[in-house]
Amino acid sequence: MNDAAEWVGPHDDMKLGLHKTAPYYYYPGWHEPGTTLEFGFNKKAYEALPADLQRTLDHAAAAVQVYSLSDFHAKNAIALGRLKTEFKGKVEILQLPVPVLRDLKKLAAGVIKEESEKTPMARKVHASFTKFQALVGPWDHVAEGAYHHFVGV
């Protein structure tokens, strides 16, 4: 028997039956701070397309991302509600302890640094991501984060 489980989010976790195998459901899922989907295109093939077809692919990829993220949020909200009601007393929902989160943050930073230094592209992507994260982090804190903290959701 498992002691605890967390995979992607309660919707997918419940499809796997994790709520039946473990009495504890821990959050946040440290291995995935946000859900995003992406499309990869062969650059040469993409650039060979007419501009209107490139725009079609760009918009289709963006639409699928927005739809998928919205669908993921809605289904996880419903599944979390089910965990709290249908499985009350069988599954306890707990936040990982702060010392554990601090250790995970430190360990993850080391792995990310190591992986980001393996190729020029990895360095470029990591630098871009880190720069953007530093830009939007303060905004997230005063916007969405503050709102959710105040409202209590």
Question: Can you describe what each PLM-predicted range is?
Answer:
Residues 1-153:
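N-terminal secretory/targeting leader peptides
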